Amino acid sequence: MELKLLQDNGTLGAGVQASPEVFEREYNEALVHQVVVAYQANARSGNRAQKDREQVKHTTKKPWRQKGTGRARAGMSSSPLWRGGGRIFPNSPEENFSQKVNKKMYRAGMRSILSQLAREGRLNVVDQFSLDAPKTKVLADKVKAMGLDSVLIIVDQVSENLYLASRNLHKVAVCEPQHADPLALVQYKKVLVSKAAIAKIEELLK
């Protein structure tokens, strides 16, 4: 599989050979969907909470007597039927949203995503990607000069300059091969991978 080399001025240069085992797989939409949804579900922190009738602060006094008023019987104002009462099935911070995806399936999903990105021309290779100073403007100008808008940059090792410069650009993300995730790969319009990172990705996903 040949991946196009992207120059600093935005032109495409000679191709770079990549493993067909990783970058030339058939696209499996169902598997990719499962892997992305599982990744998002596992990232949920469970930070929502509601109160049931036991936790709501209300008096336990019976609102009115059981019989003789003509009104429907009522036990206490914390009933879920009442305004301001507890929830019948409240959400809890202890809820478990995690979904299990086997390592084999996860790797297959990642290979499928990378292969589809390569087919669509959204995956390009660079010799290396580095900055001389930790300046956001320097990175923004470099990305713009390459004709990129929304981009995920995968490098062998993220330097401090690159990390600091990318923090304030919401359409630019930087990571190392072992930290690349399926959501980021499908979320950004373009993916830039350094030559050294290509070798690492192939090693991780074979």
Swiss-Prot record:
Domain of life: Bacteria
Function statement: One of the primary rRNA binding proteins, this protein initially binds near the 5'-end of the 23S rRNA. It is important during the early stages of 50S assembly. It makes multiple contacts with different domains of the 23S rRNA in the assembled 50S subunit and ribosome. Forms part of the polypeptide exit tunnel.
GO BP term, pick one: translation
Natural source organism: Polynucleobacter asymbioticus (strain DSM 18221 / CIP 109841 / QLW-P1DMWA-1)
Protein name (record): Large ribosomal subunit protein uL4
Pfam families tied to this protein: Ribosomal_L4 (PF00573)
SUBUNIT field: Part of the 50S ribosomal subunit.
Encoding gene, per UniProt annotation: rplD
Listed GO MF terms: rRNA binding; structural constituent of ribosome
GO cellular component, one term: ribonucleoprotein complex
